[in-house]
C-alpha cells in the first residue's frame, strides 16, 4: 500500500524547512513503496523530484518516478504541453510512438495522461517507455512521470496507471477543490 506523502512535505524535508499545513494550490502525489528520492532541485521556475527504487540510483535506473511543478506556468493546457514534449521526444528518438490514455477534468482541473515510447534510447541503447500525467493548475503546471527502461508487464502497467490516477491537485482557497485535512 502506498503511503501518502505530499510533495510539499517532501520538498520541506529535502530543503530543511519545517513541514506546515497545506496552503493554496498543492500537488498530491504518493511516495511509492520501496522508492527513495534520488534527486531533488528547486529553482525560481521549477521544483523537480526524481524517485527510484531503493536499490537503484538516478544515474543507473530501470524505473523512475519524476514529479515536476512548473511555477507560474498557467496558460498551457495538458494537450499543449503534451504536444511540446512529443516533438522533443520524436526529434531525440526516431520511431517514437505516442498514445493518449485519458483526458478530462479532475477536481475541476484540466488533466491528460499519455504514454511515449522510444524503441531505442540513443544514450542507453535500451527501450524507454514513459507514462505522463499533466495537470493545468491556476498557479502552476504539474507533471508526474513514470518511466521504464524495459517493456512493463500488464500487472506493472495496471499498478502505475492506478498510481497516476491518484495524483491530484487541490486548492485550500477553493471549497470546490478541497485539500485533505491534516491527521
Language model regions located:
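Short N-terminal segments immediately surrounding and downstream of signal-peptide cleavage
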Residues: 21-40
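Bacterial N-terminal signal peptides
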Residues: 5-14
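Signature of long, low-cysteine stretches enriched in small and polar/charged residues
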Residues: 88-133
